[in-house]
Amino acid sequence: MSFILALLGAGAVEGSIKWWSRGHRAHHRWTDTEKDPYSAHRGLFFSHLGWMLFKRPSWKIGHADVDDLNNNKLVQWQHKNYLALIFLMGVVFPTAVAGLGWGDWRGGYFYAAILRLVFVHHATFCVNSLAHWLGEGPFDDRHSPRDHFITAFMTLGEGYHNFHHQFPQDYRNAIRFYQYDPTKWVIATCAFFGFASHLKTFPENEVRKGQLQMIEKRVLEKKTKLQWGTPIADLPVMSFEDYRHACKNDNKKWILLEGVVYDVAEFMSEHPGGEKYLKMGIGKDMTAAFNGGMYDHSNAARNLLSLMRVAVIEFGGEVEAQKKNPSVPVYGDDHANAA
């Protein structure tokens, strides 16, 4: 199987196993840097084709370890005989298949050899260019690799490139059954029939962890575009007595909910339940009433309240021991009458 793949790989005329793997490993190790042999940061044209047209000195390309390839006899054989193999497998073989098969030597040369190579080459080049430009980074966005089904279609399954860069040892590009990745299907089929083994996959827990972290990051980015009011930790602290005094003597339209003081002056006329319910709560602790005692308010109501924060109450609310005159209730006439 390895020998067949070495021959077919030579037929793609994209470099020997050793040469191609060396560049690919350098690309992964030095992604988006000056040492990346086809860095996307040098432009779409450069990453697609320019890196071959404008040859850079080898010392400018980042180092990549290929000792395992140097010790592989099949890889060394293919590398040594590469020029002969590309002529045999890239031109002679496809032309002969069409010529001997149905007598179309000219069509075999033009379509099966030349036109095929043009298509295969640009499909491969799109992995270095389009896959670093189009789509999103569902696993990480620190570097340019992206996932997109259009790129997957154009590259025969190599379009889920963000996953590939995050989990390079995984034999898959696409992890969902509905995602287009014929290379994965071929490898899995070979493994099923015993032609491939030791297929590596990254733990599902870690894959999902990366996805969740990116979802959280994007949610936080969206949250920064919204108004959330003054954070509770940044609010001034006041005593319950001062809160009540401000409402009674300074005509403040404040209510207390769960230890936080809210200014409802501008909202009173807009209150869906009517203005009178807010008026009766001014200067009081309305936590129980807000949370179902009078009406169980919605999440939207709580979000709206976040824009009305004024202060937090020391100790969270009225504390008997903190009253200036503990024998006199400060909760209102109803409490006084009850006393």
Regions found by a protein language model. Name each.
Residues 149, 157-159, 274, 286:
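A short pocket-lining beta-strand/turn micro-motif at the edge of beta-sheets
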Residues 18-34, 127-141, 152-171:
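Histidine-centered catalytic micro-motifs
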